[in-house]
Amino acid sequence: MDVIDHRIKAYRFVAYAAVGFSVVAVLSVCVTLPIVYNYVHYVRKSLHKEASLCKISTNSVWDDVTVLRLAHFGNRTARQAITSSEENGGCESCCRPGPPGPPGPPGRPGRPGRPGAPGLPGVPGLPPPDGSCEPVSIPPCAECPAGPPGPPGKPGPPGDPGEDGQPGPPGQDGIPGQQGTKGPPGPPGIPGKPGESGEVGEDAECEPVAPGDQGPPGEPGPEGPPGEPGLQGPVGMPGQVGQKGESGSDGQLDFDGSPGRPGPPGPPGRPGEPGICPKYCAIDGGIFFEDGTRR
């Protein structure tokens, strides 16, 4: 029995431990699943935002590359013209230009050349012999008018949802509805407190009353429940002895019963008869009586 009790205790401990670990595991899953879901949602939102910013940056770089391809650089002729004017002198009094030549025949329109690369900075001009010339100030470049607006760009990615706005003002009260039908009567109310006792009335005047005629007898009432048992009566006189019955049949043989208890000691026996002198006494203590017997 002790071994079985120990086994039952061990199995009970193992069962309780398994149930406890299962409950802890279920609670852990219930707690960690929402956290993991929120983290995955946050990472997904961050990646989407970073991808949108990267896409916007890529589109901006591509637009800049397109603008650089379409830009026209100034040719080398204008730069050389400015350099030649600087080399010839800074003022008209020192360096006078020659007379204009005859106009040449109009040439054929040339093919549009490719935009050349920007040239190197020109060599500074030589100073005049007397050194009294002031440097010629280069006229500023005329501002070019703004070009036509470019084609509309691609729509950007949808932005993050904005914050919730402030709650609006409460609306106006509606028109009161029509009067409803009469409802069923309500339950009875709580009984009120008992009123104050009234004033003592006046005693009635006693008048002699004459007895009326006897009425007819009423119907018999229903049978009542049985009454409680009465008290025990006195002990009766013993009855007469009955006649002896017939003898019964012999019983079946059975095993002997256990020996009964020892009976009470019997009455004392009669006094013994007077003794007789023996004829011979043996050495071994044997006694022989007159009748030849040994007692």
Curated annotation (Swiss-Prot):
Extent of Low complexity compositional bias: 172-182, 229-244
Keyword set includes Phosphoprotein: no
Keyword Repeat included in the entry's annotation: yes
InterPro entries: Col_cuticle_N, Collagen
Pfam family, one: Collagen
Molecular functions (GO terms): structural constituent of cuticle
Ranges for region Triple-helical region: 98-127, 147-203, 212-277
Pro residues biased stretches: 97-109, 146-160, 217-228, 261-271
Region (Disordered): 81-278
Any one annotated GO CC term: collagen trimer
Keyword set, alphabetical order: Collagen, Cuticle, Repeat
Protein family membership: Belongs to the cuticular collagen family.
Remaining remarks: This protein shows 4 potential triple-helical regions, which contain glycine as every third amino acid.
Protein role: Nematode cuticles are composed largely of collagen-like proteins. The cuticle functions both as an exoskeleton and as a barrier to protect the worm from its environment.
Protein name per Swiss-Prot or TrEMBL: Cuticle collagen 3A3
Organism: Haemonchus contortus
